[in-house]
Amino acid sequence: MRATWLTAWHGQDIVVYRDDVEVDRVHAPDIERVVFLHRGRGDAPGDLEHAIVELEHECLVFAADTGFAGRVNFERHAFWAERACVFWVSEDRASLPVRLRRGRWYLPTAAPMFQRVPRIELAPLIDGWSLQGPQTWEQRKWRRIEDSRPFAADSRLRA
């Protein structure tokens, strides 16, 4: 039977559970940056693949099924907006080390649902990614709406 992984807020801490047993805890104010890897345009919550949480010396890698991108992100919009530390990148432009990636349906792998990784291992990869942000999910949604309007100002066009 597969283990059930969950994340939840407890005060100023984010707690990681495996089968309802606490396995890790991070003090949220210690988070320096959160990077969400998404499929396609990342328009729907189901497009999120991984959340990478950067601390001073470590990165926490969460698979989408842990709820970090859902429960933890959505329950405290004001916290993330104030911190301005949430970034986004398409999985087409960013790749994790093979041991951290989850396989597709046709080639499943046993990648971890949650793992702590030394920051020096992931920093060179993340620094090479073309990150969008900082922006919360709500800010990202409104940007998509603005960009889809007819006659919307295109920041890429120059007079």
Predicted regions and their residues:
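Eukaryotic intrinsically disordered, low-complexity regulatory linkers and tails enriched in Ser/Thr/Pro
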Residues: 1-159
